[in-house]
Amino acid sequence: QSETKLKDERFDYNVIPYSWNNTWGGGREDMVYKLANAGFKTVMSNSSAFYFDMANDNDMDAFGLNWSGYVDYFDTWAIDPQDIFANRALNRKHNITSDYILKTTKLNPNKQDNLIGIQSQLWTETVTSETILDQMLLPNLIVFAERAWAKKPYWISYQSSAQEHKMTKDWNQFLN
């Protein structure tokens, strides 16, 4: 787990940090919450959900990198920016245990306004043509827009099999 501590006297609170380095299981998934809880207006730009230049699987012909794991559309669509560990399907997919989650920092409900948004990015060091750009940008952008602007679905932090079924149904409907 990350042992990062924030010391108030070192920071200018007029800075808006963008928290991005949060590979699943790497111990930094909660950095955005640590910053928000410390009083920073901050933006979540998670590499494990919102980087469009990550490969979506280990296919040798897939475009993108894998330093932050494999990121598919479901990772972007199913994440809850206010509680990234809320969705049990994502936790299972990335082998995140309840013991691991207990050791992480949660977003303080009184500091939720400090999480001012989410941002996606597409780094272009692996984009060598317009076709590759289109393949990496457009499907991801549609999925990201759904998460960024749509009303938070009730199942996002599901605790029952009925809610998981509803999530799966909504996911299939979104895809089709």
What is each PLM-predicted segment?
Residues Q1-N176:
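Substrate-binding groove of N-acetylhexosamine-processing glycoside hydrolases
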